Curated annotation (Swiss-Prot):
Function of the molecule: Regulator of type 1 phosphatases which maintains protein phosphatase activity under strict control.
Biased composition (Basic and acidic residues): 135-147
Composition bias, Low complexity: 22-43
Compositionally biased spans, kind Basic residues: 45-55
Family matches, as InterPro entries: PPI_Ypi1
Compartment annotation: Nucleus
Lineage: Eukaryota, Fungi, Dikarya, Ascomycota, Saccharomycotina
Name the UniProt record assigns to this protein: Type 1 phosphatases regulator YPI2
Protein family membership: Belongs to the YPI1 family.
Chain intervals with Polar residues compositional bias: 1-14
Biased composition (Acidic residues): 103-118
Region listing for Disordered, in residue ranges: 1-74, 87-147
Keywords: Nucleus
Alphabetized Pfam families for the sequence: PPI_Ypi1
Encoding gene per record: YPI2
Length: 147
């Protein structure tokens, strides 16, 4: 091998290159101008920068969560509106006044029935859970039409 500043190694007509390029001619195989090397490096780095990340595109059926132009695929928050103290007291009185004087003396039966009574309204149909319940929107102009 010769003692030249080139980065190529020639072994019996086989050329090993560190960088991809065109086939070298015998006269220019050992020396390449440094300006061409720099141009090759800059063009290869420019090509790598052109990659773009995929963008999310929402369909018309996607929920506009909280009417703040935030598109979501799920309803993730359970909202309980604040009530005044008077409303809370009235609800508590109503729930406790429903119990009649014909309560059984067995307290274990009452405790088991209490859980069922809270989850079912007076008509016997269970209440939907937070993910099954669809909130009532006052401004229906922002919602898609249901067909």
């Amino acid at each position: 091998m010769s003692n030249q500043p080139s980065r190529t190694i020639v072994q019996e007509n086989n050329v090993l290159r560190l960088r991809p390029g065109s086939e070298p001619t015998p006269s220019s195989s050992n020396q390449q101008p440094p300006q061409q090397e720099q141009q090759q490096e800059t063009t290869s780095t420019k090509k790598k920068k052109k990659k773009k990340a995929p963008k999310v595109r929402w369909t018309e059926g996607t929920v506009d969560n909280e009417h703040m132009n935030k598109k979501k695929t799920k309803i993730c928050c359970i909202f309980h509106p604040q009530r005044s103290f008077d409303e809370e007291v009235e609800d508590d009185k109503h729930n406790h006044s429903c119990s009649s004087s014909d309560e059984s003396s067995d307290s274990s039966d009452n405790e088991g029935d209490k859980d069922e009574d809270e989850s079912r309204p007076s008509n016997g149909i269970p209440k939907p859970n937070a993910y099954e319940y669809q909130p009532h929107y006052e401004n229906r102009s922002k919602l898609p039409e249901q067909g």
